[in-house]
Amino acid sequence: MIVLTLAFCISAVGVYAQKADFSGKWTLDVAKSKLGERNNIETQTLTVTQAANDIKVDTATTRKPPAGGGAPGGGGMGGGGVMGRGGDGPATYMLDGKDVKSEIAGPGGTMVPVTTNAKVDGGKLTLSRSTTFNTPNGAITATSKEIWELSADGKTLTVTTERTSPRGTDTTTKVFIKG
């Protein structure tokens, strides 16, 4: 009987893990999040659409005005968006675990190569990204890794992000509420 119960519990966890669906509209709970010193996010919303082979994330961010006044701006390059993009807007990730190479708009109207990777493992979604761009001081590489986790009831999404750049490593934890 114990073996049967254990087998049922393991299979139930496996079914949940395989069906983890991050779709929905998610609103950042700033009070529950650990955003770090460099983040000036006032509000952030993720609109997520997940299919069998990909996940689409549309990010919208409102920022606090800079210290000393000035306009708050949108996404910018401040590192607040999903995948450390800083910017807002849509992004699509393939869920097959393979690297996808593309280009994004960089400084001064240049195009910057970026490599993304996404996979669902159990009830977690891992999004990785690497960007290398040239500056007058040489090439700079920035990487980020996000781990998305749903609460048991599917109403809370926790996104832990680690970014590495010439500035060092920065880790944030964002808590989003569905609805």
Regions inferred by a protein language model and the residue ranges of each:
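Bacterial N-terminal signal peptides
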Residues: 2-12
